[in-house]
Amino acid sequence: MARIAGVDIPNDKRVVISLTYVYGIGLATSKKILAAAGISEDVRVKDLTSDQEDAIRREVDAIKVEGDLRREVNLNIKRLMEIGSYRGIRHRRGLPVRGQNTKNNARTRKGKAVAIAGKKK
């Protein structure tokens, strides 16, 4: 397994897919990285030379990934909560942030349904 940005990426998969195991790199970013490094998308990770791995590492180092990206996202959410914006309040209350209805659904965000006493028929 090759190690890129502190993540072990699978050997048997194509490089373009393996790079998506790094937090912050999706398929589109993965393709851009490989194009900039001059590596084919069809190559398997186990077939990469050390020079190619170094080229990929250099390209990934220029992008904000893993811990830095997670920290930035968490700080952005914390900032929204501190300034008291609508989105920050929704984060604080554990409700959907992007305008979804909450009358019937939103169970993923709200958690397990709480039974109301005296509601039996």
Curated annotation (Swiss-Prot):
Example GO BP: translation
Protein function: Located at the top of the head of the 30S subunit, it contacts several helices of the 16S rRNA. In the 70S ribosome it contacts the 23S rRNA (bridge B1a) and protein L5 of the 50S subunit (bridge B1b), connecting the 2 subunits; these bridges are implicated in subunit movement. Contacts the tRNAs in the A and P-sites.
Q: How does it assemble?
A: Part of the 30S ribosomal subunit. Forms a loose heterodimer with protein S19. Forms two bridges to the 50S subunit in the 70S ribosome.
Against NCBIfam families, the record matches this protein to: uS13_bact (TIGR03631)
The family line of this record is:
Belongs to the universal ribosomal protein uS13 family.
The annotated regions of Basic residues compositional bias extend over 106-121
Establish whether keyword Ribosomal protein is in the entry.
yes
Q: Name one GO cellular component term.
A: cytosol
Look up the domain of life of the source. Answer: Bacteria
One example GO MF annotation: tRNA binding
- Is tRNA-binding a UniProt keyword of this protein? yes
Q: Which UniProt keywords apply?
A: Ribonucleoprotein, Ribosomal protein, RNA-binding, rRNA-binding, tRNA-binding
In Swiss-Prot or TrEMBL terms, this protein is called Small ribosomal subunit protein uS13
Span list, region Disordered: 96-121
Question: Which InterPro entries does this entry report, sorted A to Z?
Answer: Rbsml_uS13_C, Ribosomal_uS13, Ribosomal_uS13-like_H2TH, Ribosomal_uS13_bac-type, Ribosomal_uS13_CS
